[in-house]
From Swiss-Prot:
The species this protein was found in: Bacillus subtilis (strain 168)
Stimuli inducing this protein: Induced by glutathione but not sulfate (at protein level). Induced by methionine and taurine. Positively regulated by YtlI under supply of glutathione as sulfur source.
Name listed for the protein in its UniProt record: S-alkylcysteine N-acetyltransferase
Tree of life domain: Bacteria
Alphabetically ordered keywords of this record: Acyltransferase, Transferase
Disulfide linkage: none
Length: 178
């Protein structure tokens, strides 16, 4: 029987996390999508762990999925005033087994909504080169609040409301790069 553990990544996890991210983002690289996660190296992974909240799903001592939360106060130009998630990746051999969904649900409900009382969260993805990912987020309750066409792709910013009575749509804003 497998025991799943949710925890913050540490710098000691950097090497294993790099392998996970590189493996999971290989198909994205083949689509010519240039996200930081698609060109990650050990320094980038270490900095991501040190500067943000990189959460991992560990099963039987192995890191199988990860997602990072960036908070608005970590940057002078945050994507919005709500937490932003990125570097969401699951080892390919666990694809279709619900590991990524389990981790994302944990981050949305336990970490952001229940512990941090965040009214919403945001993320960015490709709507043209990687449309099935945007569709997956829509099925999970995310909505597009910003889109921009650039370099043959459509980048979209999406949000999910976690605490409706505390959500303020004006805090979404347009990303600084727009």
């Amino acid at each position: 029987m497998s025991d799943d553990i949710f925890r913050l990544a540490t710098v000691e996890d950097a090497s294993e996390l790099l392998k996970l991210v590189n493996s999971a983002f290989q198909p994205i690289r083949q689509l010519d999508i240039d996200w930081p996660s698609t060109r990650a190296d050990i320094q980038m992974v270490s900095e991501n762990i040190e500067h943000h909240s990189a959460i991992v799903l560990e099963r039987d001592g192995k890191l199988i999925s990860t997602i990072t939360i960036r908070f608005p106060w970590e940057s002078e130009t945050p994507p919005s005033k709500y937490p932003f998630v990125w570097w969401f990746a699951t080892l390919p051999e666990y694809k279709g087994q619900g590991a990524g969904s389990k981790l994302l649900t944990y981050v949305e409900e336990k970490v952001l909504r229940d512990m941090l009382k965040a009214p919403a969260l945001t993320l960015g993805t490709s709507a043209r080169k990687h449309p099935w990912l945007a569709d997956m987020y829509r099925r999970r309750g995310y909505e597009v609040y910003f889109e921009q066409e650039k370099d043959g792709d459509i980048g979209v910013m999406m949000h999910k409301v976690l605490i409706p009575e505390r959500f303020n749509p004006t805090l979404l804003g347009a990303p600084s790069w727009a």
